[in-house]
Amino acid sequence: MWKVNDQGFLNITVTGTKFNLIAITGKLGFYTDPPSHLMIMPLKIFPVHKFSKNEPNKKQKRFIYF
């Protein structure tokens, strides 16, 4: 179960499964393992790091594992 609290933070509660949160430029995606569903939503309440064109070798995907 997930919800956004009064301060604008994303609270995630997971029982009995491995849970993965994926942050992609401008969007937030998360799925369960095994993947039963995938949800993507705009990152309006999260800061997004701006990648420079002079840094093409840097990964533009950040993976956060719970």
UniProtKB/Swiss-Prot annotation:
Record's keyword annotation contains Glycoprotein: yes
Subcellular location: Virion
Glycosylation site list: N11
Keywords linked to the UniProt accession: Glycoprotein, Late protein, Virion
Keyword Glycoprotein: yes
GO cellular component, one term: virion component
Induction behaviour: Expressed in the late phase of the viral replicative cycle.
Family designation: Belongs to the asfivirus I177L family.
Name this protein carries in UniProt: Protein I177L
